[in-house]
């Protein structure tokens, strides 16, 4: 779970910006999109292949 602690002198806008950044880093929106709609076996295979290729490129 993503959590952002707001400092005393910190504005709400900057805290919200930090929260959005943390959520996007964690990949929460991508998981939600995948869970909300049915994923066919072909889509699941393609998603896993894309993820696999990304990890290969990083190495």
Swiss-Prot record:
GO cellular component, one term: ribosome
Keyword Ribonucleoprotein: yes
Superkingdom per UniProt: Bacteria
Gene Ontology biological process terms in this record: translation
Annotated spans, Disordered: 39-59
Biased composition (Basic residues): 45-59
Pfam families: Ribosomal_S21
One GO molecular-function entry: structural constituent of ribosome
Keywords noted in UniProt: Ribonucleoprotein, Ribosomal protein
Keyword Ribonucleoprotein: yes
Family of this protein: Belongs to the bacterial ribosomal protein bS21 family.
Classification via NCBIfam families: S21p (TIGR00030)
Family matches, as HAMAP family: Ribosomal_bS21 (MF_00358)
Entry protein name: Small ribosomal subunit protein bS21
Originating species: Prochlorococcus marinus (strain SARG / CCMP1375 / SS120)
Gene label: rpsU
């Amino acid at each position: 779970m993503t959590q952002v602690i707001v400092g005393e002198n910190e504005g709400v806008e900057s805290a919200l910006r930090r929260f959005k950044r943390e959520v996007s880093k964690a990949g929460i929106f991508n998981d939600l999109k995948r869970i909300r709609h049915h994923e066919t076996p072909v889509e699941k295979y393609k998603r896993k292949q894309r993820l696999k290729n990304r990890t290969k490129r990083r190495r």
